């Protein structure tokens, strides 16, 4: 029993080397990076999950730059002790008003950074970060007209007035 406790404490203290797409290396505590299902699966597949110490070769994260990976690690560090959700996300009502105050402050970034965080959370399979970033974008859209959404996200309207009218007629039932 005491040996198991030592192993779990060692695993908690273990650091994982991760390399960003621009070759910056980060040392991340194992209990922090556990939020990434992608990294967890890789460590298990390579048989590195139970070893003590630090992996010799960094795990490459080719789709994430150092600046974004730093933010992802910061988010994981803040949330590493949160309980892992066991709810089936398909069976519960989607809400966008349940973003914690720390996350609201953390996500006060420019749109480009927000979208890069979404891509990184998706690539690294960090469900909590993906949920909170997508909710932030949903809140940016909520209650806005199509024109306001275009302005918010700098989207060019490529519909002709006739095409727009046709779409309005086909979707009139949505606005009742």
Curated annotation (Swiss-Prot):
Keywords, ordered alphabetically: Developmental protein, Neurogenesis, Ubl conjugation pathway
SMART domains in the record: Skp1
Family matches, as CDD domains: BTB_POZ_SKP1
Stored Pfam families: Skp1 (PF01466), Skp1_POZ (PF03931)
Keyword Kinase among record annotations: no
Family from the record: Belongs to the SKP1 family.
Free-text function comment from the UniProt entry: Probable essential component of SCF (SKP1-CUL1-F-box protein) E3 ubiquitin-protein ligase complexes, which mediate the ubiquitination and subsequent proteasomal degradation of target proteins. Regulates cell proliferation during embryonic and larval development. Involved in synapse elimination in early synapse development. May negatively regulate the apoptotic activity of cep-1 in response to genotoxic stress. Plays a role in sex determination.
UniProt-recorded name of the protein: Skp1-related protein
Organism, scientific name: Caenorhabditis elegans
Name of the gene encoding the protein in the UniProt record: skr-1
